[in-house]
UniProtKB/Swiss-Prot annotation:
InterPro entries: ATPase_NBD (IPR043129), Chaperone_DnaK (IPR012725), Heat_shock_70_CS (IPR018181), HSP70_C_sf (IPR029048), HSP70_peptide-bd_sf (IPR029047), Hsp_70_fam (IPR013126). It comes from the Bacteria. Acts as a chaperone. This is Chaperone protein DnaK. The lineage of its organism: Bacteria, Pseudomonadati, Pseudomonadota, Gammaproteobacteria, Thiotrichales.
Protein backbone atom coordinates (compact mmCIF):
# COMPACT_ATOMS: atom_id res chain seq x y z
CA UNK A 1 0.00 0.00 0.00
CA UNK A 2 1.38 3.42 -1.02
CA UNK A 3 1.59 6.52 1.14
CA UNK A 4 -1.48 8.65 1.81
CA UNK A 5 -0.17 12.19 1.34
CA UNK A 6 -1.52 15.30 3.12
CA UNK A 7 -2.32 18.36 1.01
CA UNK A 8 -3.31 21.83 2.21
CA UNK A 9 -5.00 23.18 -0.94
CA UNK A 10 -4.93 26.88 -0.11
CA UNK A 11 -6.40 29.97 -1.79
CA UNK A 12 -2.99 31.64 -2.13
CA UNK A 13 -0.47 28.86 -1.41
CA UNK A 14 -0.59 25.08 -1.10
CA UNK A 15 1.58 22.77 0.97
CA UNK A 16 2.39 19.04 0.91
CA UNK A 17 3.39 16.75 3.79
CA UNK A 18 3.89 13.01 4.27
CA UNK A 19 4.41 10.73 7.24
CA UNK A 20 8.10 9.85 7.59
CA UNK A 21 8.11 7.15 10.23
CA UNK A 22 6.22 8.57 13.19
CA UNK A 23 6.58 12.24 12.22
CA UNK A 24 5.02 14.34 9.48
CA UNK A 25 7.43 16.00 7.07
CA UNK A 26 6.79 18.94 4.72
CA UNK A 27 8.15 18.21 1.23
CA UNK A 28 9.86 20.88 -0.88
CA UNK A 29 8.71 21.32 -4.47
CA UNK A 30 10.96 21.16 -7.56
CA UNK A 31 11.88 24.84 -7.05
CA UNK A 32 13.06 24.13 -3.50
CA UNK A 33 10.15 25.88 -1.73
CA UNK A 34 8.02 24.40 1.06
CA UNK A 35 4.85 26.06 -0.24
CA UNK A 36 3.59 26.37 -3.82
CA UNK A 37 1.52 29.35 -5.06
CA UNK A 38 -2.00 28.15 -5.97
CA UNK A 39 -1.69 29.81 -9.37
CA UNK A 40 -2.26 28.19 -12.78
CA UNK A 41 -1.46 29.84 -16.12
CA UNK A 42 -2.16 28.86 -19.72
CA UNK A 43 0.45 30.22 -22.14
CA UNK A 44 0.07 31.13 -25.82
CA UNK A 45 2.11 28.05 -26.74
CA UNK A 46 -0.41 25.81 -24.95
CA UNK A 47 1.82 25.05 -21.97
CA UNK A 48 0.26 24.87 -18.48
CA UNK A 49 2.33 26.56 -15.77
CA UNK A 50 1.70 25.91 -12.09
CA UNK A 51 3.01 27.59 -8.94
CA UNK A 52 5.91 30.05 -8.97
CA UNK A 53 6.34 29.79 -12.77
CA UNK A 54 2.69 30.81 -13.25
CA UNK A 55 2.90 33.61 -10.68
CA UNK A 56 6.05 35.07 -12.28
CA UNK A 57 4.37 35.65 -15.65
CA UNK A 58 1.04 36.93 -14.26
CA UNK A 59 1.88 40.57 -15.06
CA UNK A 60 2.25 39.88 -18.78
CA UNK A 61 -0.55 37.30 -19.00
CA UNK A 62 -3.34 38.49 -16.63
CA UNK A 63 -6.26 37.09 -18.67
CA UNK A 64 -4.92 33.53 -18.60
CA UNK A 65 -3.42 33.41 -15.08
CA UNK A 66 -5.87 31.99 -12.55
CA UNK A 67 -5.40 32.62 -8.82
CA UNK A 68 -7.76 32.48 -5.79
CA UNK A 69 -9.75 29.79 -7.65
CA UNK A 70 -10.68 28.29 -4.27
CA UNK A 71 -13.09 31.21 -3.81
CA UNK A 72 -15.07 30.00 -6.83
CA UNK A 73 -15.04 26.27 -6.12
CA UNK A 74 -18.52 24.80 -5.60
CA UNK A 75 -20.27 28.15 -6.20
CA UNK A 76 -23.08 29.22 -8.51
CA UNK A 77 -22.45 32.10 -10.94
CA UNK A 78 -25.47 34.02 -9.63
CA UNK A 79 -24.28 33.82 -6.00
CA UNK A 80 -24.13 37.31 -4.53
CA UNK A 81 -20.56 36.59 -3.40
CA UNK A 82 -19.45 35.71 -6.94
CA UNK A 83 -21.05 38.79 -8.48
CA UNK A 84 -19.98 41.31 -5.83
CA UNK A 85 -16.85 39.84 -4.34
CA UNK A 86 -14.99 37.89 -7.00
CA UNK A 87 -15.83 39.11 -10.50
CA UNK A 88 -14.78 42.66 -9.65
CA UNK A 89 -11.51 41.60 -8.04
CA UNK A 90 -9.86 39.31 -10.61
CA UNK A 91 -8.51 40.13 -14.09
CA UNK A 92 -9.60 36.83 -15.67
CA UNK A 93 -13.09 36.03 -17.01
CA UNK A 94 -15.62 34.42 -14.66
CA UNK A 95 -18.50 32.93 -16.70
CA UNK A 96 -21.80 31.11 -16.17
CA UNK A 97 -21.61 27.40 -17.01
CA UNK A 98 -24.54 25.51 -18.55
CA UNK A 99 -25.38 24.08 -15.10
CA UNK A 100 -25.34 27.54 -13.50
CA UNK A 101 -21.94 27.12 -11.82
CA UNK A 102 -19.26 29.81 -11.78
CA UNK A 103 -16.54 28.73 -14.24
CA UNK A 104 -13.55 30.57 -15.67
CA UNK A 105 -12.46 31.12 -19.27
CA UNK A 106 -9.18 31.90 -21.00
CA UNK A 107 -8.97 34.78 -23.46
CA UNK A 108 -9.07 32.14 -26.24
CA UNK A 109 -12.48 31.05 -24.94
CA UNK A 110 -11.52 27.75 -23.28
CA UNK A 111 -14.02 27.16 -20.44
CA UNK A 112 -12.95 25.41 -17.24
CA UNK A 113 -14.61 24.39 -13.98
CA UNK A 114 -12.79 25.55 -10.82
CA UNK A 115 -12.06 21.91 -9.76
CA UNK A 116 -10.32 21.46 -13.12
CA UNK A 117 -7.98 24.40 -12.42
CA UNK A 118 -7.39 23.35 -8.80
CA UNK A 119 -6.56 19.85 -10.09
CA UNK A 120 -3.46 21.31 -11.80
CA UNK A 121 -2.14 22.44 -8.40
CA UNK A 122 -2.94 19.02 -6.92
CA UNK A 123 -1.16 17.31 -9.84
CA UNK A 124 1.97 19.31 -9.05
CA UNK A 125 1.69 18.24 -5.39
CA UNK A 126 1.22 14.61 -6.48
CA UNK A 127 4.31 14.82 -8.75
CA UNK A 128 6.38 16.40 -5.93
CA UNK A 129 5.42 13.53 -3.61
CA UNK A 130 6.20 10.91 -6.26
CA UNK A 131 9.61 12.46 -7.00
CA UNK A 132 10.43 12.45 -3.28
CA UNK A 133 9.16 8.94 -2.53
CA UNK A 134 10.26 7.34 -5.80
CA UNK A 135 6.92 5.55 -6.14
CA UNK A 136 3.42 6.29 -7.50
CA UNK A 137 1.05 8.21 -5.22
CA UNK A 138 -2.70 7.68 -5.65
CA UNK A 139 -4.26 8.57 -2.27
CA UNK A 140 -4.50 11.84 -0.36
CA UNK A 141 -6.11 13.66 2.53
CA UNK A 142 -7.05 17.18 1.38
CA UNK A 143 -7.99 20.05 3.68
CA UNK A 144 -10.82 22.55 3.25
CA UNK A 145 -11.97 25.55 5.29
CA UNK A 146 -14.16 24.40 8.19
CA UNK A 147 -16.94 26.66 6.93
CA UNK A 148 -17.04 25.11 3.44
CA UNK A 149 -20.52 23.82 2.55
CA UNK A 150 -21.39 20.46 0.97
CA UNK A 151 -20.97 21.71 -2.62
CA UNK A 152 -17.52 23.12 -1.92
CA UNK A 153 -16.38 19.92 -0.20
CA UNK A 154 -17.64 17.76 -3.06
CA UNK A 155 -15.99 20.05 -5.63
CA UNK A 156 -12.67 19.74 -3.76
CA UNK A 157 -13.04 15.96 -3.88
CA UNK A 158 -13.72 16.22 -7.63
CA UNK A 159 -10.51 18.25 -8.07
CA UNK A 160 -8.58 15.41 -6.43
CA UNK A 161 -10.18 12.85 -8.74
CA UNK A 162 -9.34 14.92 -11.83
CA UNK A 163 -5.71 15.09 -10.60
CA UNK A 164 -5.58 11.29 -10.34
CA UNK A 165 -5.94 11.13 -6.56
CA UNK A 166 -8.39 9.12 -4.52
CA UNK A 167 -9.35 11.51 -1.74
CA UNK A 168 -9.48 9.28 1.33
CA UNK A 169 -10.69 12.07 3.58
CA UNK A 170 -11.67 15.73 3.42
CA UNK A 171 -10.54 17.34 6.70
CA UNK A 172 -11.20 20.83 8.07
CA UNK A 173 -8.16 23.13 8.12
CA UNK A 174 -8.35 24.23 11.79
CA UNK A 175 -8.91 20.59 12.80
CA UNK A 176 -5.80 19.59 10.84
CA UNK A 177 -3.78 22.31 12.60
CA UNK A 178 -5.05 21.10 15.99
CA UNK A 179 -4.09 17.57 14.98
CA UNK A 180 -0.54 18.76 14.19
CA UNK A 181 -0.42 20.56 17.54
CA UNK A 182 -2.17 17.82 19.54
CA UNK A 183 0.09 15.00 18.36
CA UNK A 184 3.17 16.94 19.47
CA UNK A 185 1.61 18.32 22.64
CA UNK A 186 2.00 16.34 25.84
CA UNK A 187 0.16 18.74 28.15
CA UNK A 188 -2.87 16.58 28.95
CA UNK A 189 -6.40 17.96 28.59
CA UNK A 190 -6.64 21.31 26.78
CA UNK A 191 -9.28 23.46 25.14
CA UNK A 192 -7.73 25.09 22.11
CA UNK A 193 -9.00 27.91 19.88
CA UNK A 194 -7.61 27.60 16.35
CA UNK A 195 -7.71 31.01 14.64
CA UNK A 196 -7.10 30.30 10.94
CA UNK A 197 -6.78 33.37 8.71
CA UNK A 198 -5.48 32.20 5.35
CA UNK A 199 -5.28 33.67 1.87
CA UNK A 200 -8.97 33.51 1.08
CA UNK A 201 -10.93 32.19 4.04
CA UNK A 202 -11.24 32.58 7.80
CA UNK A 203 -12.13 29.80 10.26
CA UNK A 204 -12.29 29.58 14.01
CA UNK A 205 -12.63 26.20 15.69
CA UNK A 206 -12.87 25.39 19.39
CA UNK A 207 -11.22 22.02 19.93
CA UNK A 208 -10.77 19.82 22.97
CA UNK A 209 -7.61 17.72 23.18
CA UNK A 210 -7.70 14.95 25.79
CA UNK A 211 -5.98 11.71 26.67
CA UNK A 212 -8.60 8.94 26.49
CA UNK A 213 -7.29 5.46 27.37
CA UNK A 214 -3.86 6.37 26.04
CA UNK A 215 -5.26 7.81 22.79
CA UNK A 216 -4.90 11.46 21.85
CA UNK A 217 -8.58 12.39 21.33
CA UNK A 218 -9.10 15.57 19.32
CA UNK A 219 -12.75 16.63 19.44
CA UNK A 220 -14.13 19.68 17.65
CA UNK A 221 -16.67 21.41 19.89
CA UNK A 222 -17.72 24.14 17.45
CA UNK A 223 -16.64 25.90 14.30
CA UNK A 224 -17.49 29.17 12.57
CA UNK A 225 -16.01 31.36 9.90
CA UNK A 226 -16.20 33.54 6.81
CA UNK A 227 -15.36 32.08 3.39
CA UNK A 228 -14.78 35.59 2.02
CA UNK A 229 -12.21 36.91 4.45
CA UNK A 230 -8.50 36.37 3.95
CA UNK A 231 -5.12 37.70 2.89
CA UNK A 232 -6.40 38.42 -0.65
CA UNK A 233 -8.74 41.04 0.88
CA UNK A 234 -5.85 42.66 2.76
CA UNK A 235 -3.88 42.83 -0.53
CA UNK A 236 -6.90 44.34 -2.26
CA UNK A 237 -7.37 47.04 0.39
CA UNK A 238 -3.75 48.14 -0.04
CA UNK A 239 -3.95 47.85 -3.83
CA UNK A 240 -7.01 50.13 -3.97
CA UNK A 241 -5.26 52.66 -1.69
CA UNK A 242 -2.20 52.72 -4.00
CA UNK A 243 -4.40 53.16 -7.08
CA UNK A 244 -6.38 55.97 -5.42
CA UNK A 245 -3.19 57.77 -4.35
CA UNK A 246 -1.77 57.46 -7.88
CA UNK A 247 -5.01 58.85 -9.32
CA UNK A 248 -4.80 61.85 -6.96
CA UNK A 249 -1.22 62.56 -8.05
CA UNK A 250 -1.44 61.81 -11.79
CA UNK A 251 -5.15 61.92 -12.62
CA UNK A 252 -4.98 58.42 -14.15
CA UNK A 253 -7.17 55.52 -12.97
CA UNK A 254 -5.26 52.23 -13.19
CA UNK A 255 -8.37 50.09 -12.53
CA UNK A 256 -8.98 49.68 -16.26
CA UNK A 257 -5.39 48.69 -17.13
CA UNK A 258 -5.05 44.93 -16.50
CA UNK A 259 -1.25 44.87 -16.80
CA UNK A 260 -0.79 47.82 -14.43
CA UNK A 261 -3.38 46.34 -12.06
CA UNK A 262 -1.48 43.06 -11.83
CA UNK A 263 1.78 44.92 -11.09
CA UNK A 264 0.11 46.93 -8.32
CA UNK A 265 -1.50 43.75 -6.92
CA UNK A 266 1.91 42.04 -6.66
CA UNK A 267 3.51 45.16 -5.14
CA UNK A 268 0.70 45.38 -2.56
CA UNK A 269 1.23 41.74 -1.51
CA UNK A 270 4.99 42.34 -1.19
CA UNK A 271 4.46 45.56 0.82
CA UNK A 272 1.98 43.80 3.13
CA UNK A 273 4.57 41.12 3.93
CA UNK A 274 7.29 43.74 4.54
CA UNK A 275 5.04 45.73 6.90
CA UNK A 276 4.77 42.73 9.23
CA UNK A 277 8.40 43.33 10.20
CA UNK A 278 9.08 46.95 9.12
CA UNK A 279 7.39 50.18 10.19
CA UNK A 280 7.23 51.52 6.64
CA UNK A 281 7.97 50.51 3.05
CA UNK A 282 8.27 52.17 -0.36
CA UNK A 283 6.13 50.92 -3.23
CA UNK A 284 8.07 51.83 -6.34
CA UNK A 285 6.73 50.86 -9.78
CA UNK A 286 8.51 52.69 -12.63
CA UNK A 287 6.74 53.08 -16.00
CA UNK A 288 3.42 51.90 -14.58
CA UNK A 289 1.57 53.71 -17.38
CA UNK A 290 1.90 56.65 -19.77
CA UNK A 291 -0.14 59.51 -21.19
CA UNK A 292 0.45 62.26 -23.74
CA UNK A 293 3.03 63.89 -21.44
CA UNK A 294 5.15 60.73 -21.21
CA UNK A 295 5.70 57.74 -18.90
CA UNK A 296 4.38 57.76 -15.32
CA UNK A 297 5.95 56.16 -12.25
CA UNK A 298 4.21 55.05 -9.06
CA UNK A 299 6.20 55.82 -5.91
CA UNK A 300 4.25 55.77 -2.65
CA UNK A 301 5.44 55.44 0.94
CA UNK A 302 3.21 53.22 3.11
CA UNK A 303 3.56 53.10 6.89
CA UNK A 304 2.44 50.18 9.04
CA UNK A 305 -0.03 52.50 10.79
CA UNK A 306 -1.58 53.49 7.43
CA UNK A 307 -1.90 49.87 6.32
CA UNK A 308 -3.46 48.90 9.66
CA UNK A 309 -6.04 51.67 9.29
CA UNK A 310 -6.93 50.32 5.82
CA UNK A 311 -7.54 46.76 7.04
CA UNK A 312 -8.69 47.20 10.66
CA UNK A 313 -12.33 46.48 9.67
CA UNK A 314 -11.21 43.17 8.10
CA UNK A 315 -9.44 42.15 11.31
CA UNK A 316 -12.50 43.12 13.39
CA UNK A 317 -14.72 41.07 11.04
CA UNK A 318 -12.84 37.95 12.17
CA UNK A 319 -13.83 38.44 15.82
CA UNK A 320 -17.61 38.00 15.38
CA UNK A 321 -17.25 34.32 14.29
CA UNK A 322 -14.96 33.84 17.33
CA UNK A 323 -17.81 34.97 19.62
CA UNK A 324 -20.30 32.66 17.89
CA UNK A 325 -17.93 29.67 18.09
CA UNK A 326 -17.50 30.19 21.85
CA UNK A 327 -21.29 30.48 22.30
CA UNK A 328 -21.92 27.30 20.29
CA UNK A 329 -19.32 25.43 22.36
CA UNK A 330 -20.95 26.70 25.56
CA UNK A 331 -17.64 28.16 26.73
CA UNK A 332 -16.28 31.52 27.85
CA UNK A 333 -12.95 33.07 26.83
CA UNK A 334 -11.41 32.03 30.15
CA UNK A 335 -12.06 28.34 29.33
CA UNK A 336 -9.60 28.51 26.42
CA UNK A 337 -6.17 27.21 27.45
CA UNK A 338 -4.28 27.83 24.19
CA UNK A 339 -4.81 29.96 21.07
CA UNK A 340 -3.18 28.67 17.87
CA UNK A 341 -2.54 30.97 14.92
CA UNK A 342 -2.78 29.34 11.49
CA UNK A 343 -2.56 30.86 8.00
CA UNK A 344 0.00 33.28 6.59
CA UNK A 345 -2.09 36.39 7.34
CA UNK A 346 -1.72 35.75 11.12
CA UNK A 347 1.88 36.99 10.83
CA UNK A 348 0.48 40.53 10.75
CA UNK A 349 1.12 42.23 14.14
CA UNK A 350 -2.36 43.82 14.21
CA UNK A 351 -4.02 40.39 13.82
CA UNK A 352 -1.91 38.95 16.67
CA UNK A 353 -2.72 41.96 18.86
CA UNK A 354 -6.51 41.75 18.31
CA UNK A 355 -6.56 37.97 18.87
CA UNK A 356 -4.63 38.49 22.12
CA UNK A 357 -7.10 41.21 23.20
CA UNK A 358 -10.13 39.04 22.37
CA UNK A 359 -9.04 35.83 24.09
CA UNK A 360 -7.09 37.56 26.86
CA UNK A 361 -3.98 35.46 26.31
CA UNK A 362 -0.87 35.46 24.15
CA UNK A 363 -1.40 33.27 21.07
CA UNK A 364 1.18 30.55 20.41
CA UNK A 365 3.63 31.33 17.63
CA UNK A 366 5.72 28.15 17.71
CA UNK A 367 3.77 26.47 14.87
CA UNK A 368 4.58 27.38 11.27
CA UNK A 369 1.28 28.99 10.14
CA UNK A 370 1.88 28.02 6.49
CA UNK A 371 2.66 24.35 7.17
CA UNK A 372 0.60 23.25 10.20
CA UNK A 373 -2.48 22.35 8.14
CA UNK A 374 -0.57 20.12 5.68
CA UNK A 375 1.20 18.43 8.62
CA UNK A 376 -2.20 17.68 10.19
CA UNK A 377 -3.48 16.29 6.88
CA UNK A 378 -0.45 13.98 6.67
CA UNK A 379 -1.10 12.77 10.24
CA UNK A 380 -4.73 12.02 9.31
CA UNK A 381 -3.37 10.12 6.28
CA UNK A 382 -1.18 8.16 8.69
CA UNK A 383 -4.22 7.38 10.87
CA UNK A 384 -6.18 6.10 7.84
CA UNK A 385 -3.20 4.02 6.65
CA UNK A 386 -2.80 2.52 10.12
CA UNK A 387 0.68 4.03 10.61
CA UNK A 388 -0.47 6.37 13.41
CA UNK A 389 -2.27 4.44 16.13
CA UNK A 390 -2.91 6.69 19.12
CA UNK A 391 -5.00 9.48 17.58
CA UNK A 392 -8.80 9.77 17.49
CA UNK A 393 -10.32 12.67 15.57
CA UNK A 394 -13.94 13.79 16.07
CA UNK A 395 -14.95 16.57 13.65
CA UNK A 396 -18.24 18.45 13.19
CA UNK A 397 -20.52 19.60 10.39
CA UNK A 398 -20.20 23.42 10.11
CA UNK A 399 -23.74 24.23 8.92
CA UNK A 400 -27.21 22.90 9.73
CA UNK A 401 -28.90 20.50 7.27
CA UNK A 402 -32.60 20.03 6.67
CA UNK A 403 -35.48 20.01 4.19
CA UNK A 404 -38.08 22.50 2.98
CA UNK A 405 -41.47 21.96 4.60
CA UNK A 406 -44.93 23.54 4.26
CA UNK A 407 -44.92 27.32 4.02
CA UNK A 408 -41.35 27.54 2.68
CA UNK A 409 -39.78 26.82 6.06
CA UNK A 410 -36.49 24.98 6.57
CA UNK A 411 -36.89 22.12 9.06
CA UNK A 412 -33.47 21.14 10.41
CA UNK A 413 -32.60 17.47 10.81
CA UNK A 414 -28.95 17.93 11.75
CA UNK A 415 -27.89 21.04 13.67
CA UNK A 416 -24.58 22.75 13.01
CA UNK A 417 -21.57 21.58 15.07
CA UNK A 418 -22.92 18.01 15.26
CA UNK A 419 -20.07 15.48 15.51
CA UNK A 420 -19.63 13.48 12.29
CA UNK A 421 -20.16 10.87 10.96
CA UNK A 422 -23.83 11.06 12.01
CA UNK A 423 -27.28 9.83 10.94
CA UNK A 424 -30.68 11.37 11.76
CA UNK A 425 -34.23 10.43 10.71
CA UNK A 426 -37.53 12.29 11.00
CA UNK A 427 -41.06 11.41 9.86
CA UNK A 428 -42.98 13.88 7.65
CA UNK A 429 -46.35 13.63 5.90
CA UNK A 430 -48.31 15.00 2.95
CA UNK A 431 -49.79 18.52 2.77
CA UNK A 432 -52.83 17.61 0.62
CA UNK A 433 -55.41 14.81 0.37
CA UNK A 434 -54.47 11.95 -1.97
CA UNK A 435 -51.09 13.52 -2.70
CA UNK A 436 -49.30 11.00 -5.03
CA UNK A 437 -45.72 12.23 -4.51
CA UNK A 438 -43.55 14.40 -2.30
CA UNK A 439 -40.54 16.47 -3.31
CA UNK A 440 -37.65 16.39 -0.86
CA UNK A 441 -35.75 19.68 -1.13
CA UNK A 442 -32.43 19.38 0.74
CA UNK A 443 -31.03 22.58 2.29
CA UNK A 444 -27.93 23.72 4.16
CA UNK A 445 -27.75 26.85 6.30
CA UNK A 446 -29.05 28.58 9.42
CA UNK A 447 -32.00 30.67 8.14
CA UNK A 448 -35.65 29.86 8.94
CA UNK A 449 -36.77 30.75 5.42
CA UNK A 450 -35.95 27.90 3.02
CA UNK A 451 -35.14 30.18 0.08
CA UNK A 452 -32.45 31.99 2.11
CA UNK A 453 -30.41 28.80 2.54
CA UNK A 454 -28.13 26.89 0.17
CA UNK A 455 -30.03 24.36 -1.97
CA UNK A 456 -28.12 21.07 -2.20
CA UNK A 457 -30.57 19.13 -4.36
CA UNK A 458 -34.12 17.82 -4.85
CA UNK A 459 -35.64 14.40 -5.43
CA UNK A 460 -39.15 12.92 -5.58
CA UNK A 461 -40.71 10.03 -3.70
CA UNK A 462 -43.58 8.94 -5.97
CA UNK A 463 -46.41 6.34 -5.97
CA UNK A 464 -47.70 7.22 -2.51
CA UNK A 465 -51.07 5.40 -2.06
CA UNK A 466 -54.10 7.77 -1.90
CA UNK A 467 -54.74 8.89 1.68
CA UNK A 468 -55.99 11.96 3.58
CA UNK A 469 -53.41 14.66 4.21
CA UNK A 470 -51.22 14.00 7.23
CA UNK A 471 -51.76 10.22 7.09
CA UNK A 472 -48.82 8.91 4.99
CA UNK A 473 -45.64 8.38 6.98
CA UNK A 474 -42.60 9.58 5.01
CA UNK A 475 -39.35 8.93 6.87
CA UNK A 476 -36.49 11.21 5.76
CA UNK A 477 -32.97 10.17 6.77
CA UNK A 478 -29.84 12.34 6.61
CA UNK A 479 -26.50 10.51 6.75
CA UNK A 480 -23.23 12.50 6.86
CA UNK A 481 -19.96 10.66 6.31
CA UNK A 482 -16.57 11.50 7.85
CA UNK A 483 -15.83 13.89 4.95
CA UNK A 484 -18.88 15.97 5.83
CA UNK A 485 -20.60 14.84 2.61
CA UNK A 486 -24.32 14.11 2.77
CA UNK A 487 -26.57 11.21 1.71
CA UNK A 488 -30.36 11.67 1.95
CA UNK A 489 -33.11 9.04 1.67
CA UNK A 490 -36.92 9.12 1.89
CA UNK A 491 -39.08 6.06 2.62
CA UNK A 492 -42.84 5.55 2.56
CA UNK A 493 -43.31 3.50 5.72
CA UNK A 494 -46.63 2.05 4.47
CA UNK A 495 -45.27 0.57 1.22
CA UNK A 496 -41.56 0.33 2.06
CA UNK A 497 -40.82 2.23 -1.17
CA UNK A 498 -37.56 4.17 -0.85
CA UNK A 499 -35.79 6.85 -2.84
CA UNK A 500 -32.39 8.29 -2.05
CA UNK A 501 -29.92 10.88 -3.28
CA UNK A 502 -26.21 11.16 -2.65
CA UNK A 503 -25.57 14.88 -2.84
CA UNK A 504 -22.77 14.15 -5.28
CA UNK A 505 -23.69 16.52 -8.03
CA UNK A 506 -23.92 19.41 -5.58
CA UNK A 507 -20.43 20.25 -6.86
CA UNK A 508 -22.13 20.88 -10.20
CA UNK A 509 -20.05 18.26 -12.02
CA UNK A 510 -21.54 14.97 -13.17
CA UNK A 511 -19.53 11.72 -13.23
CA UNK A 512 -19.22 12.17 -17.04
CA UNK A 513 -17.86 15.72 -16.59
CA UNK A 514 -15.31 14.51 -14.06
CA UNK A 515 -14.27 11.56 -16.24
CA UNK A 516 -13.76 13.89 -19.22
CA UNK A 517 -11.63 16.21 -17.06
CA UNK A 518 -9.60 13.24 -15.80
CA UNK A 519 -8.94 12.29 -19.44
CA UNK A 520 -8.02 15.91 -20.27
CA UNK A 521 -5.60 15.95 -17.33
CA UNK A 522 -4.05 12.67 -18.51
CA UNK A 523 -3.78 14.09 -22.04
CA UNK A 524 -2.04 17.14 -20.58
CA UNK A 525 0.32 14.85 -18.69
CA UNK A 526 1.10 13.13 -22.00
CA UNK A 527 1.63 16.52 -23.67
CA UNK A 528 3.89 17.60 -20.77
CA UNK A 529 5.96 14.42 -21.20
CA UNK A 530 6.27 15.03 -24.97
CA UNK A 531 7.37 18.61 -24.29
CA UNK A 532 9.91 17.39 -21.70
CA UNK A 533 11.27 14.75 -24.12
CA UNK A 534 11.55 17.37 -26.88
CA UNK A 535 13.51 19.72 -24.60
CA UNK A 536 15.79 16.83 -23.56
CA UNK A 537 16.45 15.98 -27.23
CA UNK A 538 17.25 19.65 -27.98
CA UNK A 539 19.63 19.87 -25.01
CA UNK A 540 21.43 16.67 -26.06
CA UNK A 541 21.76 18.07 -29.58
CA UNK A 542 23.09 21.44 -28.37
CA UNK A 543 25.70 19.72 -26.18
CA UNK A 544 26.84 17.51 -29.07
CA UNK A 545 27.15 20.47 -31.47
CA UNK A 546 29.20 22.39 -28.90
CA UNK A 547 31.54 19.46 -28.07
CA UNK A 548 32.02 18.55 -31.78
CA UNK A 549 33.04 22.08 -32.79
CA UNK A 550 35.28 22.43 -29.74
CA UNK A 551 37.07 19.13 -30.57
CA UNK A 552 37.62 20.19 -34.21
CA UNK A 553 39.12 23.47 -32.99
CA UNK A 554 41.43 21.75 -30.49
CA UNK A 555 42.65 19.10 -32.94
CA UNK A 556 43.43 21.78 -35.52
CA UNK A 557 45.41 20.47 -38.51
CA UNK A 558 45.09 16.87 -37.38
CA UNK A 559 41.56 16.94 -38.90
CA UNK A 560 41.34 17.01 -42.70
CA UNK A 561 39.39 19.70 -44.53
CA UNK A 562 36.94 17.07 -45.78
CA UNK A 563 36.32 15.83 -42.23
CA UNK A 564 35.80 19.40 -40.99
CA UNK A 565 33.33 20.12 -43.77
CA UNK A 566 31.38 16.90 -43.12
CA UNK A 567 31.07 17.64 -39.40
CA UNK A 568 30.15 21.31 -39.91
CA UNK A 569 27.45 20.27 -42.37
CA UNK A 570 26.05 17.75 -39.83
CA UNK A 571 26.14 20.46 -37.11
CA UNK A 572 24.18 22.90 -39.28
CA UNK A 573 21.56 20.27 -40.14
CA UNK A 574 21.16 19.41 -36.45
CA UNK A 575 20.88 23.12 -35.53
CA UNK A 576 18.10 23.51 -38.09
CA UNK A 577 16.30 20.45 -36.66
CA UNK A 578 16.43 21.84 -33.08
CA UNK A 579 14.50 24.92 -34.21
CA UNK A 580 11.51 22.67 -35.03
CA UNK A 581 9.26 20.54 -32.81
CA UNK A 582 9.98 17.15 -34.41
CA UNK A 583 11.75 15.09 -31.74
CA UNK A 584 12.43 12.18 -34.12
CA UNK A 585 14.05 14.51 -36.66
CA UNK A 586 16.30 15.97 -33.91
CA UNK A 587 17.28 12.47 -32.75
CA UNK A 588 18.00 11.34 -36.34
CA UNK A 589 20.25 14.37 -37.03
CA UNK A 590 21.92 13.86 -33.61
CA UNK A 591 22.76 10.29 -34.62
CA UNK A 592 24.09 11.50 -37.99
CA UNK A 593 26.43 13.96 -36.25
CA UNK A 594 27.57 11.26 -33.79
CA UNK A 595 28.44 8.96 -36.73
CA UNK A 596 30.27 11.74 -38.60
CA UNK A 597 32.21 12.66 -35.46
CA UNK A 598 33.07 9.06 -34.43
CA UNK A 599 36.33 8.77 -36.49
CA UNK A 600 37.52 12.14 -35.13
CA UNK A 601 36.69 11.06 -31.58
CA UNK A 602 38.70 7.85 -32.07
CA UNK A 603 41.62 9.88 -33.43
CA UNK A 604 41.49 12.23 -30.43
CA UNK A 605 41.26 9.29 -28.01
CA UNK A 606 44.21 7.50 -29.63
CA UNK A 607 46.33 10.65 -29.39
CA UNK A 608 45.47 11.06 -25.72
CA UNK A 609 46.34 7.43 -25.00
CA UNK A 610 49.64 7.77 -26.89
CA UNK A 611 50.54 10.92 -24.97
CA UNK A 612 49.65 9.25 -21.67
CA UNK A 613 51.71 6.18 -22.62
CA UNK A 614 54.75 8.27 -23.44
CA UNK A 615 54.44 10.09 -20.14
CA UNK A 616 54.05 6.79 -18.24
CA UNK A 617 57.14 5.36 -19.97
CA UNK A 618 59.24 8.32 -18.91
CA UNK A 619 58.08 7.89 -15.32
CA UNK A 620 58.82 4.17 -15.35
CA UNK A 621 62.48 4.91 -16.13
CA UNK A 622 62.91 7.11 -13.05
CA UNK A 623 62.94 4.47 -10.25
CA UNK A 624 66.25 3.11 -11.56
CA UNK A 625 67.87 5.57 -9.17
CA UNK A 626 68.42 4.16 -5.68
CA UNK A 627 65.00 4.00 -4.10
CA UNK A 628 63.96 4.17 -0.47
CA UNK A 629 61.95 1.02 0.12
CA UNK A 630 59.94 0.85 3.31
CA UNK A 631 59.33 -2.63 4.73
CA UNK A 632 56.04 -3.00 6.54
CA UNK A 633 55.01 -5.71 8.95
CA UNK A 634 51.58 -7.08 8.36
CA UNK A 635 49.36 -9.46 10.24
CA UNK A 636 46.60 -11.81 9.13
CA UNK A 637 43.37 -10.88 10.84
CA UNK A 638 41.31 -13.95 11.53
CA UNK A 639 37.53 -13.82 11.28
CA UNK A 640 37.00 -14.26 15.01
CA UNK A 641 39.06 -11.13 15.70
CA UNK A 642 36.94 -8.95 13.44
Amino acid sequence: MGKIIGIDLGTTNSCLAIMDGKTAKVIENAEGHRTTPSVVAYTDSGEILVGQAAKRQAVTNPDNTFFAIKRLIGRKYDDKAVQEDIKKKVPYAVIKADNGDAWVATKEGKKMAPPQVSAEVLRKMKKTAEDYLGEPVTEAVITVPAYFNDSQRQATKDAGKIAGLEVKRIINEPTAAALAYGVDSKKGEQTVAVYDLGGGTFDISIIEIADVDGDNQIEVLSTNGDTFLGGEDFDLALMNYLIDEFKKEQGIDLHNDKLALQRVREAAEKAKVELSSAQQTDVNLPYITADATGPKHLNIKVTRAKFESLVSDLVMRSLEPCKKALEDAGLSKSDITEVLLVGGQTRMPLVQEKVKEFFGKEPRKDMNPDEAVAVGAAIQGGVLAGDVKDVLLLDVTPLSLGIETMGGVMTKLIERNTTIPTKKSQVFSTAEDNQPAVTIHVLQGEREMASANKSLGRFDLADIPPAPRGMPQIEVTFDIDANGILNVSAKDKATGKEQNIVIKSSSGLSEEDIEKMVQDAEANAEADKKFHDLVTARNTADNLIHSSRKAIQELGEKVTAAEKEKIEEACKELEAATKGDDKQAIEAKTKALEEAFAPIAQKAYAEQAQAAGAQGGAKAEEPKKEEDVVDADFEDVEDDKK
